[in-house]
Amino acid sequence: MTVSTRPVLGMLLKGYPRISETFISNEILLLEQLGFAVHIFSMRRGRESFTHESVARIRAGVDYLPETFLRNSYRLLYHNLCLAMRQPRRYAAGLAVARRRFMRNRNPASLRHFLQAGYLVQRCLPSSGVVHLHAHFAHSPASVALYASVLSGLPFSFTAHAKDIYTSDAAQLREKIALARFVVTCTEYNRRHLLALAAGLQTPIHRIYHGIDTRLFTNGGDFRSTASPPYHVLSVARLTEKKGIPTVLRAVKQLQERGVRLTYTLIGDGQDRAKILALVRQLGLDPVCRWLGTQPHHVVLEHYRRADLFVLGCEVAADGDRDGIPNVLFESMVMGVPVVTTALSAIPELVEPGKTGLLVPPGRPEALAEAMLKMLADAGLRQRVIPAARERVLRDFDNRALVGRLADIYRPALSGFR
């Protein structure tokens, strides 16, 4: 591998490429277009059969770290032994950090993350040209980045998103913040939470929305300012607890019982698939509900174009997991599809009730059903909300503008970057 003549930004990801993390591949592509040299370190390979088209345009090299200890013990141990012999003091310091973090919660993942970091530093870093490590997600990628920073002497930073914030051990996350050069997060709600957790620390915590590439979401100006039965209702979501799809299904059932003619299309897949499909059958929604699984971008676009309403029932999961601002809300709004969702986490930073959408309390199917019907049937509301929502996304959440703020943060970290 040829070492870049420019300082390289190392991006540490949990998996690459991942269709559910298109916002990360878009960020990398936009940074490259601004002149950044990027190298990707991924903790595992992508598991979907297709990817977003932006991935094909990314020039960054990719190194995949050994994913599991049992199947990769020789490679992990060999490269860690080489590193320990080459840099004994740094390796001893890294072991001390790993031991301290392990003793807090006895999580064996701490050892795996440390060994992955040793592999990264010994096997991957020397030929990469990387001068700064940035991890996407505050849990395992940031753990590997922290250890790699101690073992290599390179600074690290991370972007905190949603689940990685609210399901992480508070003491472990605070230590990551303390040792990082800076932290980025994607909502003001998250930033306030992290600032409280990091009280007394000097690490800068920046709020930069992900946004979307608004050029990829067009419907030819055919906005559905009026809708008529049978209404087409759409959700695009991973099938996990925090998305609140059971609440949506119960709301659809209530509307059906009230004689409202509609069809409901659900795009996405996830660990709760069996539960959700069983609930569809239990509620007798098979005649009006279609589940399509994970779909590529062009298929999702076609469903946006046909939809009269986009709905999500976001809620806090039992383990504390929650959404920030789901990217599908940006997508729906810029496509001219009005949204009804819940007043949870950072969603009100995008959706203003009566102005750019409608919000209801989480876990309330009856309230969700009422809001859905209002947005479907009230032509005046639709005529106000649809253009205002689209304008809000175009003005404040275009990722081509937002990536400039990220670039301003990364540049000082890449000493000598021009």
Range-by-range predicted roles:
Residues 275-298:
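Nucleotide-activated donor-binding/catalytic signature segment of Leloir-type glycosyltransferases, i.e.
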Residues 189, 211:
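Carbohydrate-associated surface elements
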Residues 350-354, 358-365, 374-380:
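Conserved acidic donor-binding segment of nucleotide-sugar-dependent glycosyltransferases
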Residues 169-171, 195, 212-229, 415:
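Acidic anion/phosphate-binding donor-loop and adjacent secondary structure
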Residues 329, 334, 338-341, 351:
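Short hydrophobic beta-strand element within catalytic cores of glycosyltransferases
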Residues 305-320, 337:
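Acidic donor-binding loop of glycosyltransferase active sites
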Residues 288, 367, 374, 381-408, ...:
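A short, well-ordered alpha-helix in the C-terminal region of glycosyltransferases
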Residues 224-243, 249-252:
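Conserved donor-binding/catalytic core segment of Leloir-type glycosyltransferases
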